[in-house]
Amino acid sequence: MQNSTCQAVGECRVPEHAVLPQPLYREVVQFIESLPQKEGHLVTVLHKAQSVFGYLPIEVQQFVADHMEVPLAQVYGVVSFYTFFTMVPKGKYPISVCMGTACFVKGADKVVHAFKEQLKIDIGDVTPDGRFSIDTLRCVGGCALAPIVMVGEKVYGNVTPGQVKKILAEY
């Protein structure tokens, strides 16, 4: 662990200038300590960290690197390689539109456009109130329901641009 970047807080070492809440760091440390071994579990730990923090900024990546005893470059390499990891904050209700072949052919691009118009943001952005963000996915494996939209973990199938306003109203 790099003492120059961490400050002791109970059983957990958080970055000295941590912007994110300290209890969240403790949750990640407890998860790491529950593993039978650290080796081979970096992706699992990053999933946990992202579920706890909502995203993986460099501060969290350094924290994970320190506690997993791996170089920051290795953590960054994993985070930047896999598309399910994000280094930027998402909205409270992240919207993901599938752009796989079946979804695209059935109008997913028009659905994306409708979300962008309703929320007045672009892909990758977050609404000013922090409620929504929009991203696209390659394929979610539900081609029979194309086009598919996910809001958080909730899946919507056969979505049309006309349904976008109703979907947003649920949140």
Swiss-Prot record:
Q: Which keywords does this Swiss-Prot/TrEMBL entry list?
A: 2Fe-2S, Iron, Iron-sulfur, Metal-binding, NADP, Oxidoreductase
How is activity affected by pH? Optimum pH is 8.
Reactions accelerated catalytically: H2 + NADP(+) = NADPH + H(+)
Instruction: Spell out the molecular function terms from Gene Ontology.
Output: 2 iron, 2 sulfur cluster binding; hydrogen dehydrogenase (NADP+) activity; metal ion binding
Q: Which cofactor does it need?
A: [2Fe-2S] cluster
Q: Tell me, what controls this protein's activity?
A: Inhibited by oxygen.
Q: What is its EC number?
A: 1.12.1.3
How is the co-factor bound, per the entry?
Binds 1 [2Fe-2S] cluster.
Q: What is the stated purpose of this protein?
A: Catalyzes the reduction of NADP in the presence of molecular H(2) to yield NADPH.
> Oligomeric state and partners?
Heterotetramer composed of HndA, HndB, HndC and HndD subunits. HndA and HndB could form a heterodimeric intermediate in the electron transfer between the active site of hydrogenase subunit HndD and the NADP reduction site of the reducing subunit HndC.
Q: What is this protein called?
A: NADP-reducing hydrogenase subunit HndA
Lineage at the top is: Bacteria, Pseudomonadati, Thermodesulfobacteriota, Desulfovibrionia, Desulfovibrionales
